UniProtKB/Swiss-Prot annotation:
Residues 204-255 are annotated as: Sigma-70 factor domain-4. Keywords: Sigma factor, Sporulation, Transcription, Transcription regulation. InterPro entries: BldN-like (IPR014298), RNA_pol_sigma-70-like (IPR039425), RNA_pol_sigma-70_dom (IPR014284), RNA_pol_sigma70_r2 (IPR007627), RNA_pol_sigma70_r4_t2 (IPR013249), RNA_pol_sigma_r2 (IPR013325), RNA_pol_sigma_r3/r4-like (IPR013324), WH-like_DNA-bd_sf (IPR036388). CDD domains: Sigma70_r4. Disruption phenotype: Arrests development; a bald phenotype, does not erect aerial hyphae on minimal or rich medium (MS or R2YE), still makes actinorhodin and undecylprodigiosin. No transcription from the bldMp1 promoter (also called whiK). Significant down-regulation of 17 genes. The gene is bldN. The lineage of its organism: Bacteria, Bacillati, Actinomycetota, Actinomycetes, Kitasatosporales. GO terms for biological process: DNA-templated transcription initiation; regulation of DNA-templated transcription; sporulation resulting in formation of a cellular spore. A motif (Polymerase core binding) lies at residues 129-132. This is ECF RNA polymerase sigma factor BldN. Belongs to the sigma-70 factor family. ECF subfamily. Induction: Poorly transcribed during vegetative growth, highly transcribed during aerial mycelium formation, mRNA remains high during sporulation. Transcription depends (directly or indirectly) on bldG and bldH, in their absence bldN is not transcribed. Premature expression of this gene is directly repressed by BldD.
Amino acid sequence: MYPHVGVDASGLATLRATVKSAQDLLRGFVPTAYAVPALAAAAVPAGPCYALAEGSAVVGRRARSSSSGAAATTHRRPAADSDSARMMELVERAQAGEADAFGRLYDQYSDTVYRYIYYRVGGKATAEDLTSETFLRALRRIGTFTYQGRDFGAWLVTIARNLVADHFKSSRFRLEVTTGEMLDANEVERSPEDSVLESLSNAALLDAVRRLNPQQQECVTLRFLQGLSVAETARVMGKNEGAIKTLQYRAVRTLARLLPDDAR
């Protein structure tokens, strides 16, 4: 019913490169320049740990200041690219009761939701059940979804996240990522040696991710493996964007300490 879950090679490659940069920094001078961003004085250094944080705090302030005037004028849906506009059209049709439109939304987002749940629970059967329940709840609640800059996929992941939390509360099941099943490389042909080395490197990285605390683990999963933006991750996790950047920063630093040098 659901596709085989493979590693998002680009996401893992980016995470591995970010962790490698953090390891290099940890081997040299570090402490003061890399204080916790929320507490750092003056400008936050745009170091590698912020590679996926969508710009430094300065950039964020510039964007906010430039958009502050426009934000006060209207509350209409912002101009979006063609894909976003198409998705929102499907959402609106589904809200009007079109079953075909909801079916197309399912086709578009089921893989994303399934991957998120699978990375969290580590079992195919459980992931399939929770994915089905996610879309059942989404169908019941689709009338409550409003755009306001929020991606529909992030809304679905929020529902999935709550179901995963309920799953862990209602059982003794522990998060256990089945690394062997996730290491499915089927994009391009590589030499056997390269494939083995990449698999070993991915396995070590995923093992290190499993050893993060739950919030750091979820942040890394959403940001690197699911490819969500800082804003989307913040909405899914119920935090502000600054908290997500700090969480990501600490997670990457922890991974840099956990990951063996030969697994980079």
